[in-house]
């Protein structure tokens, strides 16, 4: 037991303590958390909730304005879920995939468009929630839990037969594939958003007037692509777990 702790558990704790830059720490129930991430995450959640309330407070048979935009986004998310998960199962996963897509999109755009770094805090600096590895890992783990839940809910313990298909010797590869999915999801999103904000920050410091604007517009585009990729992969993983293998 002691050997297991030294070999596996302790290294995991060391990895979890790795961070990029300085952070504004809060202590909650004896645990230190990144306060700046909570602040920007609450801002993003508040923005999304406020938009939803305003856009849908007075629904009309013929949508217009914000209601029309809200319905377009909902239809887009529904089509995305239908394409990735499949016609039989997609409806129950529209809320999850939609929440993931909207949260990641608004978080990314907040980093590309808002001057977070101009707001002073006691330590560290504000940035997009997806600029922090803890946020992207949490989203990736939620996705992993969801596709395991989807597969077990539909197939029961028979879901785990997929690890020995089409041949038993593929078991290690199939297990490794499942554990690599959250890693690839989290590090792809974190790396792209961090790199984008660093590039914009450097250009603003060097040439603060015109040059950063095209880069910021490019950041808006790539941020949307990253949100779409994350939501698409989440839907694809769920669809893969519920599909019937013959």
Curated annotation (Swiss-Prot):
GO cellular component, one term: plasma membrane
InterPro entries (UniProt xref): ATP_syn_F0_a_bact/chloroplast, ATP_synth_F0_asu, ATP_synth_F0_asu_AS, F0_ATP_A_sf
UniProt entry tagged with the keyword Flavoprotein: no
Protein family according to the UniProt entry: Belongs to the ATPase A chain family.
Record's subunit section: F-type ATPases have 2 components, CF(1) - the catalytic core - and CF(0) - the membrane proton channel. CF(1) has five subunits: alpha(3), beta(3), gamma(1), delta(1), epsilon(1). CF(0) has four main subunits: a, b, b' and c.
Functional description taken from the UniProt entry: Key component of the proton channel; it plays a direct role in the translocation of protons across the membrane.
Topological type in the membrane: Multi-pass membrane protein
Subcellular location: Plastid, Chloroplast thylakoid membrane
Highest classification ranks of the organism: Eukaryota, Viridiplantae, Chlorophyta, core chlorophytes, Chlorophyceae
GO function term, MF aspect, one: proton-transporting ATP synthase activity, rotational mechanism
Gene3D superfamilies per UniProt: ATP synthase, F0 complex, subunit A
CDD domains: ATP-synt_Fo_a_6
Lineage: superkingdom: Eukaryota
Keywords from the named record: ATP synthesis, CF(0), Chloroplast, Hydrogen ion transport, Ion transport, Membrane, Plastid, Thylakoid, Transmembrane, Transmembrane helix, Transport
Organism encoding this protein: Stigeoclonium helveticum
Official protein name in the record: ATP synthase subunit a, chloroplastic
Transmembrane segments: 35-55, 94-114, 132-152, 198-218, 219-239
